[in-house]
């Protein structure tokens, strides 16, 4: 089964919400995140590198107001990619996905616009 590698670089978030931030300048077909990561106690930033296309996707999730300098490796399979893409699509078109809402962030320094899905 096809898998992608994801590296969690650091963790910093508010205590009451978790968010997933997607850099929409990247090809959505290569977007991936492991849903089980939501079970981890400290997650803030995940970089996913697709070596075949040389693309890098930056995601953000978290649960705690903590800063942890640590790294973990995740394996992400195609089923998990499709599940998270369905969640994002459902939220984006306004379908009910309990506990989630869509937000658009101010363009970053490099001019890309981020889409943020807040998990409350």
Protein language model regions, located:
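Positively charged, low-complexity terminal tracts
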Residues: 1-120
